[in-house]
């Protein structure tokens, strides 16, 4: 193996630990794969779109990460088991898995039934499928690290994000249930609860009602330095916590403050969120992905405010081959 170049698909350190990031062709998933690779892991990245995975592989290899790509849809439990079988046959046991595949549906009620179906299939059933595929081998070994990316929206309901909130509430419950079920087994489960991050995910979110106006508020909020954090910083926090076996990883100051306030006074926080919801755009009949909704938002002030969000789109492979809001490739 010594003649393999750094970052090639068959790495130099064949005995290095293996991590699987489910939903890693862009956004937070890509940042997590990079951080795990820099920590010495051989990293398996999966997503639904081969072209975006290939571009992600190039970006990771440029950083010296040993990476393997497998096209995989987290909604398919059989496909998840196939990923595990393929990795175990070539690289060995999966030591760490992080389920991060996600999508955003932003808009007022009422929302389509398929918006709920897609959100729950990807962000609740997806982690269930991934964990159930990798868990048997971990249980045999009595060792493993599992991370499930939920959201502060899984703790505190957020206006205009009801399908997302519903799915993340479920994922959070699944993750916490796993934590208790596996306590003392040698397998740690980390429930990851991020606030807003500058991952470029606004570019692929689906906006309904008044797409341009929904895109404007969501993108501006996700770009503000105090409100959100850079994806690579988020990845360091997550990977560090997962590898240390922390059961709860919650971050951004607004998320920490919101969690505390909601536990102390859910009624007061609910009133505040209701007031904020009334300031958001009203209903409408249109639905567009972010990269289309963006065309209708051209003010100079918006352009200045959202500079960090645009840079994140470029940095984290959001302008990939697949221009759709539901690729489930990492928020």
Feature-to-residue mapping (PLM):
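Conserved glycine-rich cofactor-binding loop
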Residues: 23-26
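Conserved mid-core segment of classical short-chain dehydrogenase/reductases
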Residues: 103-117, 160-163
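SDR active-site lid
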Residues: 184-256, 263, 268-280
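Residue(s) in the substrate-gating loop at a strand-loop-helix junction
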Residues: 151
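Conserved glycine-rich Rossmann-like NAD(P)H-binding loop of the short-chain dehydrogenase/reductase
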Residues: 41-55
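The beta1-alpha1 cofactor-binding region of Rossmann-like NAD(H)/NADP(H)-dependent oxidoreductases
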Residues: 71-82
């Amino acid at each position: 193996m010594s003649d393999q170049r750094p970052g090639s698909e068959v790495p130099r350190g064949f005995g290095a630990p293996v991590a699987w990031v489910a939903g890693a062709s862009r956004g937070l998933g890509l940042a997590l794969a990079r951080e795990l690779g820099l920590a010495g892991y051989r990293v398996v990245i999966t997503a639904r779109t081969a072209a975006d995975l290939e571009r992600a592989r190039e970006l990771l290899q440029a950083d010296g990460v040993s990476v393997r790509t497998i096209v995989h849809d987290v909604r398919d439990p059989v496909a998840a088991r196939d990923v595990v079988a393929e990795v175990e046959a070539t690289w060995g046991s999966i030591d760490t898995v992080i389920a991060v595949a996600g999508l955003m549906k932003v808009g007022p009620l009422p929302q389509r039934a398929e918006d709920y179906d897609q959100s729950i299939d990807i962000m609740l059933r997806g982690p269930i499928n991934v964990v159930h595929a990798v868990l048997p081998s971990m249980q045999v070994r009595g060792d493993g690290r599992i991370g499930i990316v939920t959201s502060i929206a899984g703790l505190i309901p957020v206006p205009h994000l009801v399908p997302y909130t519903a799915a993340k509430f479920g994922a959070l419950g699944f993750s916490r249930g796993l934590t208790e079920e596996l306590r003392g087994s040698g397998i740690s489960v980390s429930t990851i609860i991020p606030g807003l991050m500058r991952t470029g995910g606004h570019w692929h979110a689906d906006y309904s009602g008044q797409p341009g106006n929904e895109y404007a508020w969501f993108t501006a909020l996700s770009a503000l330095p105090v409100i959100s954090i850079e994806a690579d910083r988020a990845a360091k926090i997550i990977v560090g916590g997962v590898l240390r076996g922390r059961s709860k990883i919650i971050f951004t100051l607004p998320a920490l403050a919101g969690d505390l306030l909601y536990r102390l006074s859910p009624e007061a926080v609910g009133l505040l969120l209701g007031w904020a919801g009334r300031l958001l755009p009203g209903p409408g009949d249109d639905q567009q992905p972010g990269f289309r909704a963006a065309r209708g938002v051209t003010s100079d002030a918006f352009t200045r405010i959202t500079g960090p969000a645009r840079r994140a789109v470029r940095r984290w492979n959001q302008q990939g081959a697949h221009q759709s809001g539901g690729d489930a490739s990492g928020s």
